[in-house]
């Protein structure tokens, strides 16, 4: 999978304090935030709004020495997605497992050029939706958003070895769920 390079330059500290500066800072990372929020969630707009509000409120806490703007913003988006899942789980039975919910145009385009045959994509999306939340997040970040292991670790706030374990366990579960069609 091709990795997309994202600008890593950071705005001046005082520039983050303005709405325009903050907007310019978020803009290059927005498509990845949208894709992450939209995976298996019909509440993507709410998740994104909550993520932006949280990022705005916490902007003074951003430390470029601890990670990139991309990983920081994706971590906030992942947190908001998890909160939305927990809220939904209290009232419904795993609504994010609906493979048709929240598909973005970019995701549809990726699926059109995917190496997974069309008749198996829906099964794969459903199977990923049944994974434990951390395993599904690791799969989404690494395989769908194209983040490297170190960036996934930064987003998930865990060691790289833990990310590798989540990915390995997720692949094992997916193989078990999907059978020989995906080998």
Residue ranges and their predicted role:
Residues 15, 52-69, 87-89:
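Sigma70-family region 2
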Residues 3, 9-35, 42-45, 56:
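A short, charge-rich alpha-helical start-of-domain segment used by transcription regulators
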Residues 46-53, 67-79:
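Structural recognition of an alpha-helix C-terminal capping motif at a helix-to-coil junction
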Residues 84-119:
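Short, basic/polar amphipathic helix motif occurring as a linker/hinge flanking DNA-binding modules
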Residues 138-142:
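A short pre-motif secondary-structure segment
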Residues 30, 34, 52, 132, ...:
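C-terminal flanking helix
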Residues 57, 61, 75-96, 169:
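Arg/Lys-rich amphipathic alpha helix in sigma70-family domain 2
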Residues 78, 82, 156-180:
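DNA-recognition helix of helix-turn-helix
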